């Protein structure tokens, strides 16, 4: 019946709220927003040492575990992270970077978070540009400096084409400079 279904949904929500007691407010906000906005995928973003954006998509049901444990991936496939002999790596989402992606239309959206790259024992990867930046900011702070840093995400727009063997045609002739 409808009332028993509603009771089960409320029990599930209460159980989740009890578990959220151990989470920080940013994790709680991300989980609540994913549920309220009917987000279907969360993209976990990180970069290689060359600054190339990498993305792993997870379902909302996987987000809580990703906050707690991270998500494993093959680090040897990412430029500059590891050698093949030490390929297991973990991405752990930073809930302070949670954002609904605005270009995904329709009732169900997609969100993204930037991630830290960790070794299997939970230590920051020395090949993670985000970790290198955090170290540099920490050293600068020790010397009395404060920096404000944000990612610069760039893209190009091309005309739609059905034949992918052709060279892409830019939408405009504007240049970078």
Go through the PLM ranges and name each one.
Residues 20-177:
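Glycine-rich, acidic/polar active-site loops that bind/position phosphate-bearing ligands
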